[in-house]
Amino acid sequence: MRERTEARRRRIEEVLRRRQPDLTVLLENVHKPHNLSAILRTCDAVGVLEAHAVNPTGGVPTFNETSGGSHKWVYLRVHPDLHEAFRFLKERGFTVYATALREDARDFREVDYTKPTAVLFGAEKWGVSEEALALADGAIKIPMLGMVQSLNVSVAAAVILFEAQRQRLKAGLYDRPRLDPELYQKVLADWLRK
């Protein structure tokens, strides 16, 4: 039993050393549990520490088995509205890119994800709202070559977040701890209780 406990602690410390506090997602009214769960699972896979959500209906997000338990390892901060979410991210130095099917949107691979970055994803059916687009620093898109012009929101999140991971790996951002020591200890204590 002691070996399992020590192995678990080592694994938690290894994962925590790679967490990227300056890479996140902002989810605008993404309310389907399977999409939210899949996005959080991808966030965990690429090292996102905290995701953000705005749900205008005020409901508390729910998860399903798609998360693989990742909602325990990626914090989800729910904001009361878009302005509060943007204020929170901007005060922390994030550039916010909204995903959008627009002519003026940049190819998602042209963005430098090694800088503090939040990627905004919109509701499953409608995408990012005009209000959110107006607040964002820029719009990005995943080029589509087929007849279908959009991907499921959780698939789009995976595509973009793994590009961010690729860039960050190349820049060596996973090679050293990114959390300040106080936050590291706080999160470590929380994770060890789970």
UniProtKB/Swiss-Prot annotation:
Residue numbers binding S-adenosyl-L-methionine: T99, G122, A123, E124, K125, W126, I142, L151
A biological process from GO: tRNA guanine ribose methylation
Complex and partners: Homodimer.
GO MF annotations, alphabetized: tRNA (guanine(18)-2'-O)-methyltransferase activity; tRNA binding
Gene: trmH
Stored PANTHER family: RRNA METHYLASE-LIKE (PTHR43453), TRNA_RRNA METHYLTRANSFERASE SPOU TYPE DOMAIN-CONTAINING PROTEIN (PTHR43453:SF1)
Comment block on domains: Both N- and C-terminal regions function in tRNA binding, but the substrate tRNA is determined by the catalytic domain.
InterPro entries, alphabetized: Alpha/beta_knot_MTases (IPR029028), rRNA_MeTrfase_SpoU_C (IPR022724), SpoU_MeTrfase (IPR001537), TrmH (IPR033671), tRNA_m1G_MTases_N (IPR029026)
Pfam families per the UniProt record, alphabetical: SpoU_methylas_C, SpoU_methylase
Source superkingdom: Bacteria
Name listed for the protein in its UniProt record: tRNA (guanosine(18)-2'-O)-methyltransferase
EC assignment: 2.1.1.34
Further facts: Binding of TrmH to tRNA is composed of at least three steps: the first is bi-molecular binding and the subsequent two are uni-molecular induced-fit processes.
Function: Catalyzes the 2'-O methylation of guanosine at position 18 in tRNA. Type I methylase, which methylates all tRNAs.
Mutagenesis / variant outcome for changing E124A: 2800-fold increase in Km for AdoMet
Impact when changing N152A: 80-fold increase in Km for AdoMet
Catalyzed reactions: guanosine(18) in tRNA + S-adenosyl-L-methionine = 2'-O-methylguanosine(18) in tRNA + S-adenosyl-L-homocysteine + H(+)
Membership in a protein family: Belongs to the class IV-like SAM-binding methyltransferase superfamily. RNA methyltransferase TrmH family.
Keywords, in A-Z order: Methyltransferase, RNA-binding, S-adenosyl-L-methionine, Transferase, tRNA processing, tRNA-binding
